[in-house]
């Protein structure tokens, strides 16, 4: 998965946008923000609902996001402006918050699916094959239950029941605060 993130960050579309279009002074800040919202974020986060986020992936995504936002704001790293201040100035929520909210939203969809749907069956499946040596990889189910516990305060044993209640789940996701120290 990390190679996929690295590939997306270094994609030709991103580099071309970052180097040529976004740095043009002729474009308004509003137009550059539109490019950020309509092209950059979807290319970077395609399929993000199923990602298991590690600290390294979080760091890489945040660095790519802030690199783009620095250019949108017309700033360089030498200006030493905090990420939080740049985001507030541009009116943009943290990309990691968007990813976490979408991942938890996908869990809500899974919880409300009727029995027999393929995504729900894959979610419930326990692999029977033998694992390779070393630390086991984190499964999406374990990652998402830990995320819900840390960020929403929903215990893992109650997670599916709470996620089935659409109104409650949506209100919890709307109240999801940014991670401390993410700015």
Where are these regions (language model features)?
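Short linear motifs embedded in intrinsically disordered, charge-biased segments
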Residues: 1-183
């Amino acid at each position: 998965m990390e190679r996929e993130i690295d590939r997306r960050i270094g994609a030709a579309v991103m580099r071309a946008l970052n180097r040529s279009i976004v740095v043009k002074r002729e474009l308004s800040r509003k137009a550059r923000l539109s490019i950020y919202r309509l092209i950059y974020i979807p290319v970077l986060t395609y399929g993000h609902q199923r990602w298991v986020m590690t600290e390294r992936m979080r760091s890489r995504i945040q660095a790519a996001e802030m690199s783009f936002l620095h250019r949108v704001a017309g700033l360089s790293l030498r200006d030493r402006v905090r990420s939080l201040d740049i985001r507030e100035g541009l009116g943009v929520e943290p990309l990691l918050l968007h990813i976490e909210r979408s991942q938890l939203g996908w869990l809500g969809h899974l919880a409300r699916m009727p029995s027999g749907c393929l995504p729900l069956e894959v979610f419930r499946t326990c692999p029977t094959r033998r694992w390779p040596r070393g630390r086991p990889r984190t499964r999406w189910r374990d990652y998402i239950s830990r995320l819900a516990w840390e960020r929403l305060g929903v215990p893992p044993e109650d997670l599916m029941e709470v996620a089935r209640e659409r109104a409650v789940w949506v209100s919890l996701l709307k109240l999801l605060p940014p991670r401390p120290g993410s700015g």
